């Protein structure tokens, strides 16, 4: 079955049963209408390639350049490590992206598969000038990426991407099939629920960096959902689009850890996915066609810009986001 359909359908199911997280449809409609009044057209390229902390060596006017794999290697490592920074209050996504960018500039071969299998905690420290939360898991996941690329794709990320035949759904399926660390699913009320956050964001980042060409060309990019993390629900709650139960709201306010796989955690993530689906449908009806991933990036960027003013986000120790 299409993995992106699984994400969309199972998260909608959880949203319909959710006890701790509800959608405020009136606030949702207001946010969408306000957006439509301000932005009739939104280009995706400004959101990814124009971020100074990202590495991107693509010359979009040069067809050969859109098939070079250095940026793709960077993106795979980036999204392998793109999870759970909150235990370190002084480390955010842009620190991760910039640290990897600097490492790649210093040594363009550092993200080759035969180098990834040798990564240690000392390597991580060298890349960022400090230890990251859960370093041992990050090392394991990076080594897994190198091992899989060597065993199944001749050490070539380009070969892996091209084997998907320009299908985002196929590439997400490949990533979750071969890289166990990307298998982001859980059990809710006895039923498996799928998110595939880091697998999807890997495809979305390729599309953004390569601007939908070469290694970033995906004919079904519209099928990607948003990437369920902790920043987007944080901004949605601030905008009153989602509402937490008193118990959950108090836990988040007091920075109490929400157990991974708990009903509360899964409802936060699933309802967030479903909200973005509803926003996308609203925009499309308003003749402003946006992808779920574009809405995700805009909400995430809005949350990052308001970081000092936002209430706490939920805290869950996980390797998935």
Swiss-Prot record:
Q: Does the keyword Hydrolase apply?
A: yes
In short, the EC number is 3.2.2.-
Superkingdom of origin organism: Eukaryota
Query: What would be an example GO MF term here?
Result: hydrolase activity
Catalytic activity annotation: queuosine 5'-phosphate + H2O = queuine + D-ribose 5-phosphate
Q: Which InterPro entries match?
A: Q_salvage (IPR019438)
The positions flagged as active site in the entry are 229
Sorted alphabetically, the keyword list is: Hydrolase
Other noteworthy facts: Eukaryotes lack the canonical genes for de novo biosynthesis of queuosine (Q), present in most bacteria. Therefore, this molecule must be sourced from ingested food and/or the gut microbiota, and metabolized to its corresponding nucleobase, queuine (q), before incorporation into cytoplasmic and mitochondrial tRNAs. Incorporation of q into the anticodon of some tRNAs contributes to translational efficiency and accuracy.
State what this protein does: Catalyzes the hydrolysis of queuosine 5'-phosphate, releasing the nucleobase queuine (q). Is required for salvage of queuine from exogenous queuosine (Q) that is imported and then converted to queuosine 5'-phosphate intracellularly.
Q: What is this protein called?
A: Queuosine 5'-phosphate N-glycosylase/hydrolase
List the taxonomic lineage.
Answer: Eukaryota, Amoebozoa, Evosea, Eumycetozoa, Dictyostelia
């Amino acid at each position: 079955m299409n993995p992106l359909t699984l994400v969309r359908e199972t998260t909608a199911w959880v949203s319909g049963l959710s006890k701790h997280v509800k959608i405020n449809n009136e606030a949702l409609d207001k946010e969408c209408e306000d957006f439509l009044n301000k932005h009739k057209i939104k280009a995706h390229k400004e959101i990814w390639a124009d971020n100074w902390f990202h590495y991107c060596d693509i010359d979009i006017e040069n067809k050969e350049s859109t098939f070079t794999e250095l940026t793709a290697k960077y993106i795979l490592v980036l999204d392998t490590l793109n999870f759970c920074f909150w235990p370190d209050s002084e480390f955010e996504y842009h620190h991760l992206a910039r640290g990897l960018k600097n490492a790649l500039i210093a040594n363009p071969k550092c993200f080759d598969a035969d180098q990834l299998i040798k990564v240690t905690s000392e390597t991580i420290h060298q890349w960022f000038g400090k230890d990251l939360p859960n370093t041992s898991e990050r090392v394991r996941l990076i080594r897994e990426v190198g091992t899989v690329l060597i065993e199944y794709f001749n050490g070539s990320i380009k070969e892996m991407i091209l084997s998907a035949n320009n299908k985002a759904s196929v590439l997400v399926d490949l990533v979750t099939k071969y890289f166990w660390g990307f298998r982001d699913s859980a059990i809710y009320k006895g039923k498996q629920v799928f998110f595939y956050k880091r697998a999807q964001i890997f495809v979305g980042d390729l599309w953004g960096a390569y601007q939908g060409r070469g290694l970033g060309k995906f004919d079904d990019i519209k099928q990607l959902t948003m990437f369920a993390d902790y920043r987007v629900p944080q901004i949605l709650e601030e905008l009153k689009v989602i509402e937490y139960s008193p118990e959950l709201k108090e836990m988040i306010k007091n920075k109490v850890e929400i157990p991974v796989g708990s009903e509360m955690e899964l409802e936060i993530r699933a309802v967030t996915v479903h909200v973005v689906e509803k926003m996308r449908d609203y925009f499309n009806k308003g003749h402003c066609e946006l992808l779920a991933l574009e809405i995700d990036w805009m909400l995430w960027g809005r949350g990052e810009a308001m970081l000092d003013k936002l209430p706490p986000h939920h805290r869950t120790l996980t390797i998935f986001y």
